[in-house]
């Protein structure tokens, strides 16, 4: 997600085996065929660099929530720093937005999910470079994480530039569906926000049509500039910059949990 559209990996890496013990049998070696399958079928990427491989072994096991155990009632206990609120980013791609938000909001805890090996690798490098203690990572299908998180635990969810699945026969694979909106609403606090950005007009319309019919959310926009302009605290991404260069106009939606 987050506009991450990458090419097939050159093949598996055996040097990652120690780190992969933190994952279940469905997600073994991050560079193996078993894990080259993303949310709804795309988890391909370039081979990891040496530093990323090292961080998969040394840092990632410290950041991964154990989904085989019940989630703590207070997610702040997953972190070693004082926090006021919890947020979720689904499909963080190059991690530019995630890292910028974590730096700007040190008292917010971030759980970030991505099914792409390369996205996890980039995030690990950035977390290590900036010595961030308020991020936890989930490597795999975001639906697993949505089912694990406790009700009303989050203040905000960011879903930025998810795969639009442009072919009509694939629309059922789009992240925004009636069922996924219910699942997102369950884990948001009352008054919490779902923020969604896309550069695909059809996906923007698709999302609005479903959210406006949802009993759980209200669209906060009062004028066109509210969704045509980035949010005041929005950190742009490389994918977004590329979309703008190619003439696509992003839409920025904020939906509030009732």
State where each predicted segment sits.
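A cross-taxon signal for low-complexity, glycine/charged-rich
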Residues: 3, 7, 11-13, 17-21
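S-adenosyl-L-methionine
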Residues: 20-88, 96-103, 124-152
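Conserved SAM/SAH-binding beta-strand->alpha-helix loop
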Residues: 116
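A short glycine-rich, Lys/Arg-flanked "PGG" loop and its adjoining helix->strand segment in the class I
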Residues: 176-190
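Class I S-adenosyl-L-methionine
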Residues: 209-258
